[in-house]
């Protein structure tokens, strides 16, 4: 699960954590071993540790050093290794998909086993062509497969970081707008009180002059 390292980003971390709880609820009773969670982002680590039915796993130190591309690759390699060794049956990633500055969608996608995306059907002309692969298809797949997982993991990370910054900008903009509105209301209240004080002083002066 990808989250934020810092706060001041609205409900960003909370929504990611809720998505994790929904996922755990789906798995409840369906798996015997605990669900292994790799939390990338300091803000959710303590909450996840207190969550029932999960085992929090360490992530590469590269993330703390802000070497994000290398960290994503190292994490992907760790997940691939555990999957091939049958330590885990399935790997899913929870992250914030960046759609636009005002829209970030909390998503959950399957990383392993990798399912290729559907492509458009080939025309008869293309389908009848014969291709010779060198080296063979199996060797090509063994080389490309990790690269696809690496790039996909890095994409999840970048989208989540972009969504985090967008949420932070929007939160700060809302806070700024609320502060400006509050200042205007306070200024209006101050002007009213000032006018009341001036009126009271004038009434005292006029009353004193009449006497």
Regions found by a protein language model. Name each.
Residues 1-211:
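C-terminal beta-strand-loop-alpha-helix "lid" module of Rossmann-like NAD(P)-dependent dehydrogenases
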């Amino acid at each position: 699960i990808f989250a934020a390292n810092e706060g001041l980003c609205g409900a960003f971390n909370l929504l990611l954590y809720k998505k994790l709880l929904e996922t755990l609820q789906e798995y409840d009773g369906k798996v015997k071993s605990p669900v292994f969670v790799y939390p990338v982002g300091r803000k959710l680590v303590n909450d996840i540790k207190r969550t029932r039915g999960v085992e929090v796993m360490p992530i590469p130190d590269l993330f703390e050093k802000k070497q994000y591309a290398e960290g994503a690759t190292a994490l992907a390699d760790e997940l691939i290794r555990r999957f091939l060794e049958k330590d885990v049956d399935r790997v899913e990633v929870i992250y914030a998909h960046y759609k636009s500055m005002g829209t970030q969608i909390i998503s959950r996608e399957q990383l392993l086993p990798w399912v290729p995306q559907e492509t458009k059907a080939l025309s008869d002309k293309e389908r009848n062509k014969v291709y010779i692969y060198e080296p063979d298809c199996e060797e090509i797949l063994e080389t490309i497969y990790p690269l696809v997982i690496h790039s996909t993991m890095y994409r999840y990370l970048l989208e989540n970081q972009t969504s985090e910054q967008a949420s932070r900008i929007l939160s700060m903009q809302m806070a700024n707008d609320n502060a400006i509105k509050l200042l205007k209301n306070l200024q209006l209240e101050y002007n009213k009180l000032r006018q009341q004080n001036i009126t009271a002083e004038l009434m005292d002066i006029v009353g004193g002059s009449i006497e």
